[in-house]
From Swiss-Prot:
Disulfide bond residue pairs: C107-C344
Organism: Vibrio parahaemolyticus serotype O3:K6 (strain RIMD 2210633)
Coiled-coil residue windows: none
Primary location recorded for the protein, binned into one broad class: cytoplasm
Protein name as catalogued: Dual-specificity RNA methyltransferase RlmN
Amino acid sequence: MTTEKINLLDFDRKGMRQFFAEELGEKAFRADQVMKWIYHFGVDDFDNMTNINKKLREKLQHKCEIKAPTVAEAQHSSDGTIKWAMKVGDQDVETVYIPEEDRATLCVSSQVGCALECKFCSTAQQGFNRNLKVSEIIGQVWRAAREIGLQKETGRRPITNVVMMGMGEPLLNMKNLIPALEIMLDDLGFGLSKRRVTVSTSGVVSGLDQMTGKIDVALAISLHAPNDKLRSEIMPINDRWDIQDFLASVRRYIASSNANRGKVTVEYVLLDHVNDDMGHARELAELMKDTPCKINLIPFNPYPGSPYKKPSNSRIDRFQKTLMQYEHTVTVRKTRGDDIDAACGQLVGDVIDRTKRTAALKAARGAETIDVKAV
């Protein structure tokens, strides 16, 4: 019988030091050295850790491994975006690299599928299987950094920002999200600025309250409707925590945060003739008057079987200008990677659906839905 090895990617600095002390009988500085090899140099072979003595390397090889998700498939967009299908166990999640002139952002998944049922999101149509482990969250960053490193000759920009906006609702995976964020921020890990790591939530108030005062990163909220009636129709989570509960929690978080500079980013996907008329814009402006924010409008990105459409450019423009009349800061997100289905709301993986959600959707809509495995 073989003992399963411990994946060192599952440990933040505190956990790594504790493991080294209790399981290996080693001092904290040895744990720190190994973390540097893993995250600063992308090393996954203990033999290549040249400042670690042979006895410890042998111990590590016997008990431990450094195992990140592997790339099952890579797709390259004409705009430079790369979408990777990352293998996690017997399923896939998607991770997206988005290069821009002054930065390169990595969009990271937190769940296999999604436990929520937002009506406009392709990931939600796949159902839900499980939360990702720490090693599977931070491992996406590790693997992407290595993939980009291998492409240095193409002049690709190193990862400067991470957004938890991939598959899944991050705040329903708090146990594994927090250590992964700690590694992203840690100087022994990826050493990213807290303003360059963003967590997006659809309104899990219990998770946001748990984050408050515990970890400081940029916050984005998926609002997508200016009133409870409409929001509950397109985002059922609103029946659990309504808009006012959600925004009160948001205000508590940004009051405790330096990363947000006193403001939250509001994400609002524009669905043609659903939530994009001028009345909705005025309602949204009024709703957000007591919550310092910048509003990011996201024109809907279509996917197979979706009942929604992208608004016309004129409707998008009118919506933005109406909000700006109320002195809100408003941007329209530039669509990136839509030619490889890597844009916002388009991410899908290889999900063994435990919720039976996909089967129900197929029965309701007909065959034109995203094909997934069902159990």
